UniProtKB/Swiss-Prot annotation:
HAMAP family: MatK. Keywords: Chloroplast, mRNA processing, Plastid, RNA-binding, tRNA processing. This is Maturase K. Belongs to the intron maturase 2 family. MatK subfamily. It comes from Carpinus orientalis.
Length: 504
């Protein structure tokens, strides 16, 4: 946003949300080229002279609005040219350009809300690991958890209808609808592996924006009821008028939807629940009875079906007791087990024993799924026995060692917050031995002979990062004490999951 504030008349667009004229600005097409286009594809276009041709973009938009426009068959869509340009190239340009201008209302609202609340923007809030300190603080005091899979809209029109709540410009929405139907060919947008099935990889930014806008609208309704009701529940009885206003607001929301959804809302006068989401999976946790959790389940199902017209089933939401269920979330197995302990105590002449059962969040490394990810990447077989990586055998020794060490360190970095670190030793063993077998395969030698020649220097490369980090925490302690330290370390610079950890 900061790059374009000198060009855009933000005050006018803030008032009217007229975004359609922006797509015909030359600097938008140039910014779309700089942000998203592949340079290799540009070189293949003979009519492209290192500048974004706004005239051709206008012609392509005009063709989409025409009833009898020339259709390019799917068999030769990558080779055909129309007026000397590549259709995929300029469809990508329109996609990137629309993504840039459609993000303007969201960015303006975010900046204004941060400035109005005087909130300091912290980059640590982007870290995935910032979720786990929250879970450690809240989960030991809760009883039940609901594992929710957010349903995906299977039709493009649902995403367009969702976007109209934020973008008031009808022309932009019409252009988006024409563009999606022109280039999707009726394909389903989302698939079962919880990732976006992109009909063209070049349009990933646009589809991610549309999906995030759908999630934003869903959470705006859900979190409004949760936050407002929780606030009123914690305040004194002097805010009776605020409580009446909230219940009236909930009634207004219910009138918008069908009668079934109105019946569900009436049960949720005082919800008090914790909510965490990452990608297409969310967690609801509460201290109340299972009855309230079941009410929340049917509330969410009714919200998706009645408001967003997305099919959902109560069976997609699993309610379990935290002390008896392990939660699979963000590559960790998390639960809150009861750890009974006997504490002897004495008061005057009477002695007695106190049964204490403290609850603490356990975050465990999922060994079996991780081994499955390593086997899929050809580092080991299905049983976890290390094998060589033949596709890397043509690299230099330095590159081979560096790749294995980087994978091992990234996994150690991500799973540093595990409460039980013994599982990581097996993962490191698989990667180390796979590295040795790959090097031995390259040099056509046995593993024993190669290790004898190389020595123990190779194994030290896999453990240096953790020891260097602990030396910063305990600079004055001995090396032995640092090796014995097994506390949790949550890094606040992890903005994406490790590819091997993302086994869901």
């Amino acid at each position: 946003m900061e790059e374009f504030q000198g060009y855009l008349e933000l005050d006018r667009f803030r008032q009217h949300d007229f975004l359609y004229p922006l797509i015909f600005r030359e600097y938008i097409x140039x910014x779309a080229h700089d942000h998203g286009l592949n340079r290799v594809i540009l070189l293949e276009n003979l009519a492209y002279d290192n500048k974004s041709s706004l005239l051709i973009v206008k012609r392509l938009i005009t063709r989409m609005y025409q009833q009898n426009h020339l259709m390019i068959s799917a068999n030769d869509s990558n080779q055909n040219r129309f007026l000397g340009y590549n259709k995929n190239l300029y469809s990508q340009m329109i996609s990137e350009g629309f993504s840039i201008i459609a993000e303007i209302p969201y960015s303006l609202r975010l900046i204004s809300s941060l400035e109005g609340a005087q909130i300091i923007r912290s980059y640590n809030l982007r870290s995935i690991h910032s979720i786990f300190p929250f879970l450690e603080d809240k989960f030991p005091h809760l009883n039940y958890v609901a594992d929710v899979l957010i349903p995906y809209p299977i039709h493009l029109e649902i995403l367009v209808q969702t976007l109209r709540y934020r973008v008031k410009d009808a022309s932009s929405l019409h252009l988006l609808r024409f563009f999606l139907h022109e280039y999707s060919n009726g394909n389903i947008l989302f698939i079962l592996n919880k990732s976006i099935s992109i009909f063209s990889k070049s349009n990933s930014r646009l589809l991610l924006f549309l999906y995030n806008s759908y999630i934003c609208e869903y959470e705006s309704l859900f979190l409004f009821l949760r936050n407002q009701s929780s606030h009123l529940r914690l305040t004194s009885s002097g805010v009776l008028f605020e409580r009446i206003y909230l219940h009236r607001k909930m009634g207004d929301l219910a009138e918008v939807f069908v009668n079934d959804f109105r019946g569900i809302l009436c049960f949720l006068k005082d919800p008090f629940i914790h909510y965490v989401r990452y990608q297409g999976k969310s967690i609801l946790s509460s201290k109340d009875t299972p009855l309230l959790m079941n009410k929340w389940k049917y509330y969410l199902v009714s919200l998706w079906q009645c408001h967003f017209y997305v099919w959902s089933h109560p069976g997609r939401i699993y309610i379990n007791q935290l002390s008896k269920h392990s939660l699979d979330f963000l590559g960790y197995f998390s639960n809150v087990p009861l750890n009974p302990s006997m504490v002897p105590s004495q008061m005057l002449e009477n002695s007695f024993v106190i049964n204490n059962a403290p609850k603490k969040l356990d975050t465990i490394v999922p060994i079996i799924p991780l081994i499955g990810s390593l086997a899929k990447a050809k580092f080991c077989n299905a049983l976890g026995h290390p094998i060589s990586k033949p596709t890397w055998a043509d690299l230099s020794d330095f590159d081979i060692i560096n790749r294995f060490v980087r994978i091992c360190k990234n996994l150690s970095h991500y799973y540093s917050g595990s409460s039980k670190k013994k599982g990581m030793y097996r993962i490191k063993y698989i990667l180390r031995l796979s590295c040795v077998k790959t090097l031995a395969r390259k040099h056509k030698s046995t593993i024993r002979a190669f290790l004898k020649r190389l020595g123990s220097e190779l194994f030290e490369e896999f453990f240096t990062e953790e020891e260097e980090f602990l030396s910063l925490i305990f600079p004055r302690t001995s090396f032995t004490l640092r090796r014995l330290y097994r506390g949790r370390v949550w890094y606040l610079d992890i903005i994406c999951m490790n590819g091997l950890a993302n086994h869901e």
